[in-house]
Amino acid sequence: MQFDELLTEQRNHRSTHIDRESTLEMVATINREDHRVARAVQKELPQIAAAIDAAYPKFDQGGRLIYVGAGTSGRLGVMDATEIQPTYGLTAEQTFGLIAGGEPALTHTVKAAEDSIELAQEDLAAVQLTAQDIVVASAASGQTPYTLAALQYAQEKGALGIGFSCVEDSPLAQLANYPITPVVGPEVITGATLLKAGTAEKMVLNMLSTGIMVKSGKVYQNLMINVVPTNGKTFERAKKIIAEATQTSLLAAERALERANNHVPLAIVLIETKGTIAEAKALLAATNGHVSQAVKLNDKQH
């Protein structure tokens, strides 16, 4: 399919007169179009769930979550990777984003970078991609050369390939192990895929990373438990998380945190199981750090 034939490049008849609308009418037009994004993403929920279920065992066993894209798609991937690091206590080696053109492309357009097949291969070769890794490749059009080449390279290495695009049956969708294709339709401003397509990508990446982290034991109940107390503020936050998770007092949470040497998951298991440090550590080791599984294992043993 020619680029100008793509749905993402078509004119939107609902916004043809946006340049003549009042400011309120203009933002109402944009808002109405944004409502279509959530519905489009909703149709992809089974595929998103399947991708999460395929990805989290790899991540849980040491695989890396790697985002790849060009332009807006690449920047959104870098952002998701960067944000989930402090949220779930990850390192920059466990999850990161690769964008066509490298770091300069985060703030400037790097000419021709998105068209380079060689650059994609070099970028993934440089991080020593393995079959244990997960590659999330995003391109609104589904045919960006850099992104396609990255996904092809990932397939050759045996890595899990998740592909986001907004065009049905795109080359990216056909190449991915798990294609996720919310068809959001033409943009309010013709071809400006930073709008609905970008919003859809942000929603999908949020779901993917959150789902993988939850399934990998980085969350207990709905609490971020991998907070690392490094100062007064984060120490207070850690105490509150422990207290809420275990329905205990802040004082009891503080004592458990001290016993656990500031390791929040260990402190939670200590309180929930009423065991010793050694027993709590053994439970976490047996469940690969999953707090909920550690608590369940303790219940079975007693």
UniProtKB/Swiss-Prot annotation:
Molecular functions (GO terms): carbohydrate derivative binding; carbon-oxygen lyase activity; ether hydrolase activity
Keyword Lyase: yes
Occurrences of domain SIS (ranges): 55-218
Active site: E83, E114
Alphabetical UniProt keywords: Carbohydrate metabolism, Lyase
Pathway: Amino-sugar metabolism; N-acetylmuramate degradation
Classification via InterPro entries: Etherase_MurQ, MURQ/GCKR, SIS_dom, SIS_dom_sf
CDD domains: SIS_Etherase (cd05007)
EC number(s) from the headed UniProt entry: 4.2.1.126
Pfam families noted in UniProt: GKRP_SIS_N
Keyword match Cell membrane: no
Any GO BP annotation: peptidoglycan turnover
Enzymatic class: lyase
Catalysis performed (reactions): N-acetyl-D-muramate 6-phosphate + H2O = N-acetyl-D-glucosamine 6-phosphate + (R)-lactate
Miscellaneous section: A lyase-type mechanism (elimination/hydration) is suggested for the cleavage of the lactyl ether bond of MurNAc 6-phosphate, with the formation of an alpha,beta-unsaturated aldehyde intermediate with (E)-stereochemistry, followed by the syn addition of water to give product.
Similarity remark: Belongs to the GCKR-like family. MurNAc-6-P etherase subfamily.
Role according to the record: Specifically catalyzes the cleavage of the D-lactyl ether substituent of MurNAc 6-phosphate, producing GlcNAc 6-phosphate and D-lactate.
Self-association state and partner proteins as the record states: Homodimer.
This protein's name: N-acetylmuramic acid 6-phosphate etherase
Protein source organism: Levilactobacillus brevis (strain ATCC 367 / BCRC 12310 / CIP 105137 / JCM 1170 / LMG 11437 / NCIMB 947 / NCTC 947)
Gene name of the encoded protein: murQ
